[in-house]
């Protein structure tokens, strides 16, 4: 469960290392984001000499959460960290690589480019 003020690791090579969620996109009173939800975030930590700079406002999609994701078959999927991939306005990732596993539910939510770049889909 990601809410405003939550810190996220960045799971791509866009240049950001840490993001802080400032808004969960969806309805006006939405409190939490789960895997596959879009958030607006601010870049808190960056890699030197990359296009994304500190304090830049970006859109991101959540790809991993520590809170369990319950599937229809009863399996609960939990990850070790909260992570997101920085995306542009069209929903395509701004980086060219995705690090770490991502959930299969992203494919159903039309984030196929992120799923194809990921090394492991759970």
UniProtKB/Swiss-Prot annotation:
Top-level lineage group: Eukaryota
Keyword Ribonucleoprotein belongs to the record: yes
Keywords: Chloroplast, Plastid, Ribonucleoprotein, Ribosomal protein, RNA-binding, rRNA-binding
Keyword Calcium: no
GO cellular component, one term: cytosolic large ribosomal subunit
A Gene Ontology biological process term: translation
PROSITE patterns cross-referenced by the UniProt entry: RIBOSOMAL_L14
Annotated GO MF terms: large ribosomal subunit rRNA binding; structural constituent of ribosome
Subcellular location field: Plastid, Chloroplast
SUPFAM superfamilies xrefs: Ribosomal protein L14
Pfam families registered for this protein in UniProt: Ribosomal_L14 (PF00238)
Function: Binds to 23S rRNA.
Assembly information from the UniProt record: Part of the 50S ribosomal subunit.
Family of this protein: Belongs to the universal ribosomal protein uL14 family.
Protein name: Large ribosomal subunit protein uL14c
Species this chain originates from: Zygnema circumcarinatum
Taxon lineage: Eukaryota, Viridiplantae, Streptophyta, Zygnematophyceae, Zygnematophycidae
